Each structure stands twice: as structure tokens, then as C-alpha cells.
């Protein structure tokens, strides 16, 4: 399974995951199992974030964990769930951006809490 494209779309990513599952993974885990795995993977991202950007220090065996790799594990399971439930993430993402834009186009610009550094100058 070779991916020659430099830029991978969400649709390509969904297809790549599906091909990988069918070639190497035998079949998808159940949706509920994948939801539990997603929760586990998000926890691994949280662990890195808490140690890298928060107040906790790394445990010796966690020092070399890659945030990018853990984020990709989250993305992988999201892509699996989308494939299993028939969600085209590319279309859903476009619709979601439009929804957010319509709902929030002025909300954040008018939020004085987000401009606190400007008022301190």
C-alpha cells in the first residue's frame, strides 16, 4: 500500500485506513470497542500535554513519546469510526466549518477576553 500523494485529503485518509484494515487488520473492531480505544488514545495525548505544557514532569519511560504519533493514533481511530458509520469526513468537515462560521463569525472577534493583551499595551 503506497501513498504517493504529498497532500492527503480526509477522503484519502479514510480510504487508506479502510485499505489497511482490509489488508492487515482482518476487520474493523466494533464501533463500541473503537470508541473505547479513541478514549484511550485521547488520554495518551492528554498525558503528553500535561507533562510537556502543564505542571507534571515526564516519567522516565514517557520522555520519548511523540505528540504527533499520539495525535495520529487519535486520527486513525476517528477515521475508523467514520468508515464504520458511513460518515464522509471531508463533507462533514466542510459542513462543520460552515456551521461554526455562521454561528461564531462575530462571537470571538467581539470577545474582550481574547483581546486582553491588546488592552494591556
How should each PLM-predicted stretch be described?
Residues 1-71, 75-121:
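Flexible "arm" and connector segments at domain edges
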Amino acid at each position: 500500500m503506497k501513498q504517493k500523494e504529498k497532500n492527503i485529503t480526509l477522503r484519502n485518509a479514510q480510504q487508506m485506513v479502510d485499505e489497511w484494515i482490509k489488508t492487515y487488520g482482518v476487520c474493523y473492531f466494533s464501533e463500541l470497542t473503537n470508541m473505547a480505544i479513541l478514549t484511550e488514545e485521547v488520554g495518551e495525548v492528554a498525558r503528553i500535554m500535561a507533562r510537556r505544557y502543564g505542571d507534571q514532569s515526564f516519567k522516565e519511560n514517557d520522555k520519548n513519546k511523540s505528540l504527533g504519533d499520539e495525535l495520529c493514533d487519535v486520527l486513525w481511530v476517528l477515521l475508523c469510526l467514520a468508515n464504520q458509520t458511513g460518515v464522509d469526513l471531508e463533507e462533514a468537515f466542510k459542513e462543520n466549518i460552515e456551521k461554526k462560521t455562521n454561528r461564531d463569525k462575530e462571537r470571538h472577534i467581539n470577545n474582550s477576553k481574547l483581546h486582553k493583551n491588546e488592552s494591556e499595551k
